[in-house]
Amino acid sequence: MQCALYDAGRCRSCQWIMQPIPEQLSAKTADLKNLLADFPVEEWCAPVSGPEQGFRNKAKMVVSGSVEKPLLGMLHRDGTPEDLCDCPLYPASFAPVFAALKPFIARAGLTPYNVARKRGELKYILLTESQSDGGMMLRFVLRSDTKLAQLRKALPWLHEQLPQLKVITVNIQPVHMAIMEGETEIYLTEQQALAERFNDVPLWIRPQSFFQTNPAVASQLYATARDWVRQLPVKHMWDLFCGVGGFGLHCATPDMQLTGIEIASEAIACAKQSAAELGLTRLQFQALDSTQFATAQGDVPELVLVNPPRRGIGKPLCDYLSTMAPRFIIYSSCNAQTMAKDIRELPGFRIERVQLFDMFPHTAHYEVLTLLVKQ
């Protein structure tokens, strides 16, 4: 992938950009095999990759510069701002949005937040695009609601320029820390969720719900999990750390009982909406802590699917699963180091199948799907 920002030394986020994709995949596979070297693996499936540029469905832009000449991108460690509107990881459809947002920031008087001076209002611009219909969700992360009335007043102009903006919100993040969002979300549009569709499964994206940033590879990840589950004798499963329900909604059949657990209530609202659209009445999604939910249950289903954050599922949940011993565990991980650590805590299971998904090209990161079977 060619990147003028990298060539000019202005951005180093894609540390592996100089390596061809096949070399990147080989290095990631070697890393994964090294992490799982202590465990016999019955089947290594071929790694899955997608496009090497223009694949991201989301931009998280730090806003800096002045209100008349805002920069959208990042801050270097020394505080120097860098405009990343031309980053080749973004699809071409993002360029007109960035181009319209810069004059809009001036129109609405949204002074960029200055970290050194602790002054200004606009901290971040968060943009998400649906692959299904090209609709977009735009979030303005502000320090306070001081500029809210001005923003609302200027909004018709932005809608005129960018009719693809289906959901627009203001998020209030008052803390002087590098935290992307606060708890308060103010909707400026009637529509509150972005419609997405992977493999004919309707999915919804709300402002404070996690959604994979590489849709081409994520849709293959969900489809693979579905195929693996269909090969197993499963009538009842848990989907822990389920997010908007991507895994559970793909894996469920009309006669299957499924419980999806996720701490974020916004994500659970999305999952419930999708289940209703699919007419799946035996799916139950609840906004709870996954570990607390599981460890409070007196029995387990045949299959437990886990998709934890980078820290992994942790010892308490590993101990519970070791004791209760479901027949199958499917572990989807964005951090193979913590997954390997967790598998070490599950001695009663063997690894039947592993597959790497190159969700983050040009970096050392990857996603991995693992099928564990009770010995």
UniProtKB/Swiss-Prot annotation:
User: Which Gene Ontology MF annotations are present?
Assistant: 4 iron, 4 sulfur cluster binding; iron ion binding; rRNA (uridine) methyltransferase activity; rRNA (uridine-C5-)-methyltransferase activity
InterPro entries attached here? 23SrRNA_MeTrfase_RlmC (IPR011825), MeTrfase_TrmA_AS (IPR030390), MeTrfase_TrmA_CS (IPR030391), SAM-dependent_MTases_sf (IPR029063), U5_MeTrfase_fam (IPR010280)
**Record has Translocase as a keyword:** no
Name the residues annotated as catalytic in the UniProt entry: C334 (nucleophile)
Keywords assigned: 4Fe-4S, Iron, Iron-sulfur, Metal-binding, Methyltransferase, rRNA processing, S-adenosyl-L-methionine, Transferase
Binding-site list for S-adenosyl-L-methionine: Q212, F241, E262, N307
Instruction: Give TM regions.
Output: none
The enzyme's first-digit EC class, named in words, is: transferase
Any one GO biological process: rRNA base methylation
May I ask which residue range the UniProt record assigns to the signal sequence?
Answer: none
Intrachain S-S bonds = none
Residues that bind [4Fe-4S] cluster: C3, C11, C14, C87
Q: What is its EC number?
A: 2.1.1.189
Record Gene3D superfamilies: 2.40.50.1070, Vaccinia Virus protein VP39
Quickly give the catalysed reaction. uridine(747) in 23S rRNA + S-adenosyl-L-methionine = 5-methyluridine(747) in 23S rRNA + S-adenosyl-L-homocysteine + H(+)
SUPFAM superfamilies xref list: S-adenosyl-L-methionine-dependent methyltransferases
UniProt family annotation = Belongs to the class I-like SAM-binding methyltransferase superfamily. RNA M5U methyltransferase family. RlmC subfamily.
Role played: Catalyzes the formation of 5-methyl-uridine at position 747 (m5U747) in 23S rRNA.
Protein's name in the database: 23S rRNA (uracil(747)-C(5))-methyltransferase RlmC
The taxonomy runs: Bacteria, Pseudomonadati, Pseudomonadota, Gammaproteobacteria, Enterobacterales
What's the gene? rlmC
